[in-house]
Amino acid sequence: MKVLHVYRTYFPDTQGGLEEVIRQICLGTRKQGVSSRVFTLSDEPFPAFLPRVEADVVRVRKTFEVASCGFALTGIRRFIKEVERADIVHYHYPWPFSDLLYLIAGQRKPAVLTYHSDIVRQKFLLAMYRPMMERYLGHMRRIIATSPNYFATSEILNGFAEKVDVIPIGLDEPSYPTTDERNRDLARVRETYGENYFLFVGVLRYYKGLHILLDAAKGAPYRVVIVGAGPVEAELRKQARIEGLDNVSFAGFVSDREKMALFGLCRAVVFPSYLRSEAFGVTLLEGAMSAKPLISAEVGSGTSHVNIHGDTGLVVEAGNHLALRDAMDVLHQDQGLADRMGQNARHRYEQLFTGKLMGERYKALYT
């Protein structure tokens, strides 16, 4: 079976949670006999065809961008060719240009769609786009929500409830660096950041709530390590500098091996996203896989499907830096509680969020 995934960006051009989700779907279904390709845009699509372990990547040049939505008018012909090759086309929402691609050429093959997030910020543009979006979603054979929480709270998904299935995101642990590989970086990570710090990993975007995390870290007797880069990085560094946050470290992008070493030495994973743009939180899954307790905010999304308050970690009021600080203080002061919650998080990962389970569910969807 040949599946064509369609999304606006992918490795190696960008690194983020949604790219990782697509990678994990490809890896999980590969073990079920599925051959995947990813059709995506790139500012520099050379080479245009890039074989990777999980999938072959087909890149076309991005022509222009509006409100973070890339367009590639010259790539339509290549898209048609890839659709003809595929048995099923798997779209990843939101990306309005993919609506156009589907309506122009995608109706030739069965289509499914993973609904990763509502459009939260661009209300005016959403009002203009909505008629096309509803037509697009209405044509899908099935629509996948990544958590029961998001399905329950999304107006758009509830409008297509008869088409919706829930398949939680899963991670294939063997696709991550091994313990031996991670251990090669442990000494350097320990020397740079120490141990028992609070760890954030992700693209530094407005909805991640990192300004709230910096407010919570002020005067704390422990370190906060922020891994990643992104659009609001300069603002965050300025805030940390002005407020004299010597206990906050910006690590930038790191290798997968170093990232897993950072998970290994942290006290807990902190994930302060405060808007529904944060639909799931792959970092929370990586923390759970690493047997670490989780701290997240309640935004009515999949973050609270991964992190169960009082069991796998602590869930706080969104946007409340005092509540976030209290949660970090609790886990900083009680190693035993942190360890128990970390083990519970690992158990929940094993029961619900493995790559194998996700791969089996998507293979069943495709067939």
Model-predicted regions and their roles:
Residues 6-16, 20-70:
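N-terminal strand-loop element at the rim of the active site
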Residues 138-177:
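A short, active-site helix/loop in glycosyltransferases that binds the activated sugar's phosphate group
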Residues 234-257:
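Nucleotide-activated donor-binding/catalytic signature segment of Leloir-type glycosyltransferases, i.e.
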Residues 289, 293-297:
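Short hydrophobic beta-strand element within catalytic cores of glycosyltransferases
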Residues 91-98:
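Short His-centered aromatic/hydrophobic patch
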Residues 308-321, 328-335:
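Conserved acidic donor-binding segment of nucleotide-sugar-dependent glycosyltransferases
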Residues 20, 24, 196-219, 231-237, ...:
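A conserved mid-protein helix/loop that constitutes part of the nucleotide-sugar donor-binding site
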Residues 264-279, 292:
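Acidic donor-binding loop of glycosyltransferase active sites
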